[in-house]
UniProtKB/Swiss-Prot annotation:
It comes from Mus musculus. Belongs to the bile acid:sodium symporter (BASS) (TC 2.A.28) family. Residues 339-362 have a biased composition (Polar residues). The lineage of its organism: Eukaryota, Metazoa, Chordata, Craniata, Vertebrata. One of its GO terms (biological process) is response to nutrient levels. This is Hepatic sodium/bile acid cotransporter. Glycans are attached at N5, N11.
Amino acid sequence: MEAHNVSAPFNFSLPPGFGHRATDTALSVILVVMLLLIMLSLGCTMEFSKIKAHFWKPKGVIIAIVAQYGIMPLSAFLLGKVFHLTSIEALAILICGCSPGGNLSNLFTLAMKGDMNLSIVMTTCSSFTALGMMPLLLYIYSKGIYDGDLKDKVPYKGIMLSLVMVLIPCAIGIFLKSKRPHYVPYVLKAGMIITFSLSVAVTVLSVINVGNSIMFVMTPHLLATSSLMPFTGFLMGYILSALFRLNPSCRRTISMETGFQNVQLCSTILNVTFPPEVIGPLFFFPLLYMIFQLAEGLLFIIIFRCYLKIKPQKDQTKITYKAAATEDATPAALEKGTHNGNNPPTQPGLSPNGLNSGQMAN
């Protein structure tokens, strides 16, 4: 379907001056500062030797790339068919599905106690791979949805900029950990406090900028699609890595990397490809998708943290039981003079080789 033959649904129009207001500029600057701080903090948790190991044995990276560019685009395409979405709706979802992994995956991997070295390597490789995979996937899956040429709309400069904003602060963090480790706790604490404060500012500015415009994309089928896509990524990423027998830490990492998409790139493509009168409220679909990414990611973190609190209690019960059994046996052994102070007492009357004292005497 040609873009110029499609009209914006709901007679939608963007807020006046959208994208050029002072609040828009402030939001963009804050998001950049947040990303740099997060990547710097995450770099302080990484080790160069472990990063190099993931390149020498790239099993986890390959699985993640397959999950990212195999599962997510196919899921987006199938969901568009299942929910009978319009051409523009299906295209907006497909662009999100073909985007590389987002930087939020690194932060959520840290919260899920995943492999941070693998996470950063995966994000970097995913972005590099996007330079070729995004135009190819958009060309393949958009056939029958959109008659225009999407492969020329891929924001290559945006992808390269996102790589720079990941690699440079991470490299600084790795340097600090290896050469100035005494600074690392201060960097992590300051980064956490500043990031939390900026998150509040981002929330307030986003509400001011978008207002009630996002309500236009909260239709039942778009809500269902934007909730199922990240969930599918989280679930299938974990299952795929489990099938290849990766350790639990790597499974959680690949799960987060697969489920989180770079919605900023999706917004850029939609903005470049379609004028507002064509894309209409679907301009805000990436924001809706990001909300569900965050909500589902936080839900998985809560479930995982609850699991960690329950699991040690079971282990502690076993330890306490064994300790109690040893304590009950010790007084009796002391009375008989058979306790040596280190090992649990043996059965009375038996020597270590299984013969009683009478048999030994004979």
